[in-house]
Structure formats: structure tokens, C-alpha cells
């Protein structure tokens, strides 16, 4: 079943290759969507794909890349049209 989740990741998540690493992991898992920095220092990600793959990526977001220090990941289910790829915005 295809699911779509919007995530807000807080902590030391900008300037640590978080977006590029998220894209790499998403592509590895077959998840589509996007990831971007927010002005308040958080990272926002939209994840769409098979529920199992999206859950795996959500779990990975709690760790992130080596230099990241994630303190919180908030997520909510959203409904949007199908996305074809994963991009860094």
C-alpha cells in the first residue's frame, strides 16, 4: 500500500549532509518525495512509497548521517498526488 508522510526533523540537521543523505537512503529504499531545509533550522521531508519502505526511512531519519544530532522527528500522514522521484529542494 502506498503511503505519504510529511516529517519535520529537529536538532543539528542542517550543514551536516542531512538532505543529500536522506535522498540517498530514499533512493535505496525506493521512496519518492523531497527534502528541504527550513528557515527555523529544521529539515522537512515528504516521503511517499510502500508503507514498509516509508517506515524504514522514517526510522532512519532519527539517526540521519554521521554528523547529525536528531532530537525530534514529527510526522503526519498527508494525501497528495503521486510523486515520481526524490529530490533535494
UniProtKB/Swiss-Prot annotation:
Pfam families, per database record: Acylphosphatase (PF00708)
Residues covered by the Acylphosphatase-like domain: 4-89
Assigned keywords, A-Z: Hydrolase
SUPFAM superfamilies registered for this protein in UniProt: Acylphosphatase/BLUF domain-like
Active site: 19, 37
InterPro entries, alphabetized: Acylphosphatase, Acylphosphatase-like_dom, Acylphosphatase-like_dom_sf, Acylphosphatase_CS
Catalysed reactions, semicolon-separated: an acyl phosphate + H2O = a carboxylate + phosphate + H(+)
EC number: 3.6.1.7
Claim: Phosphoprotein is one of the keywords in the record: no
GO function terms (MF aspect): acylphosphatase activity
NCBIfam families tied to this protein: PRK14451.1
PANTHER family found in the cross-reference section: ACYLPHOSPHATASE
Family that this chain belongs to: Belongs to the acylphosphatase family.
Protein name: Acylphosphatase
